[in-house]
From Swiss-Prot:
Name by which UniProt lists this protein: Transcription termination/antitermination protein NusG
Taxonomic path: Bacteria, Pseudomonadati, Pseudomonadota, Alphaproteobacteria, Rickettsiales
Species per Swiss-Prot/TrEMBL record: Rickettsia conorii (strain ATCC VR-613 / Malish 7)
SUPFAM superfamilies xrefs: N-utilization substance G protein NusG, N-terminal domain (SSF82679), Translation proteins SH3-like domain (SSF50104)
Biological processes per GO annotation: DNA-templated transcription termination; regulation of DNA-templated transcription elongation; transcription antitermination; transcription elongation-coupled chromatin remodeling
Pfam family for this entry, one: NusG
Function: Participates in transcription elongation, termination and antitermination.
Domain KOW: from-to ranges: 140-168
Signal peptide residue numbers: none
Family: Belongs to the NusG family.
Superkingdom of origin: Bacteria
Alphabetic keyword roster: Transcription, Transcription antitermination, Transcription regulation, Transcription termination
Length: 192
C-alpha cells in the first residue's frame, strides 16, 4: 500500500470501523489460508482488527459410489470475505499470508464492499443453498402431492426433473387418464 492510500483508508479505520473486503487466494487453498489467518491474528494479538472471516459455501447432496453424501460447494472459489478494520498493520498481516494473492480493488488500495454488495453475496449464498436443497428433494418415480395451482391436492408421480429450471414433470390422473403436467419445485410436496 502507498502512504497516500493508507492515509485515505485510515481516516475511516481510525474510528475502528470494520468493513467487508474480498481477498483473492490460491485455488483450493481457502480453508488453509483462513486457518493461517486465524493463527496469525491470534499470535500477533490483532483480534480487535478482525470481526469475521468467511468462505462462502453451501451444502449439497451428491451421489458418490452409489451413496448420498453431503459436500460443500464454494459460491466464490478462490475468494475469502473478511470483515476487518483496514490499517497498514492489518493489511500487511493478510497480504503476507502464503496463498493470498491480493485484495479486491487496486494493487495499493483495497476496495471495501458496500452493504448492498455484501447483502447480495449473502442472498446468493442463501439462494444457492435453497436451490441445492430443492434439486435433491425429488426423484423420478416418487409420489408427490400438488400444493398450488389448478391441480392442488392431486397426487402424481414424478416423471422428469429439470434441475436448471427447478421444474418437475408430474403425471396426475385426470378423469382416470394419466396426464403429465409441469410444475415448479415449490408447487409440490413429498408424500410421507
Amino acid at each position: 500500500m502507498t502512504a497516500q492510500s493508507i492515509d485515505n483508508i485510515l481516516s475511516s479505520s481510525e474510528k475502528n470501523v470494520k468493513q467487508w473486503y474480498v481477498v483473492h487466494t490460491a485455488s483450493g487453498a481457502e480453508k488453509r489460508i483462513k486457518e493461517d489467518m486465524l493463527r496469525k491474528i491470534a499470535k500477533q494479538n490483532m483480534t480487535h482488527f478482525f470481526e469475521d472471516i468467511l468462505i462462502p459455501v453451501f451444502g449439497v447432496s451428491e451421489v458418490k459410489r452409489g451413496k448420498n453424501v453431503k459436500v460443500e460447494k464454494k459460491l466464490m472459489p478462490s475468494y475469502i470475505l473478511i470483515k476487518m478494520n483496514m490499517t497498514d498493520k492489518s493489511w500487511h498481516l493478510v497480504k503476507n499470508i502464503s496463498g493470498v494473492t491480493g485484495f479486491l480493488g487496486s494493487k495499493t488500495t483495497p476496495k471495501a464492499l458496500t452493504e448492498s454488495e455484501i447483502q447480495n453475496i449473502f442472498n446468493n449464498l442463501e439462494a444457492e443453498a435453497k436451490e441445492a436443497k430443492n434439486s435433491k428433494l425429488y426423484e423420478v418415480g416418487e409420489i408427490v402431492t400438488v400444493t398450488d395451482g389448478p391441480f392442488e391436492t392431486f397426487m402424481g408421480t414424478v416423471e422428469e426433473i429439470d434441475q436448471e429450471k427447478n421444474r418437475l414433470k408430474v403425471s396426475v390422473a385426470i378423469f382416470g387418464k394419466a396426464t403429465p403436467i409441469e410444475l415448479n419445485f415449490n408447487q409440490v410436496k413429498k408424500n410421507d
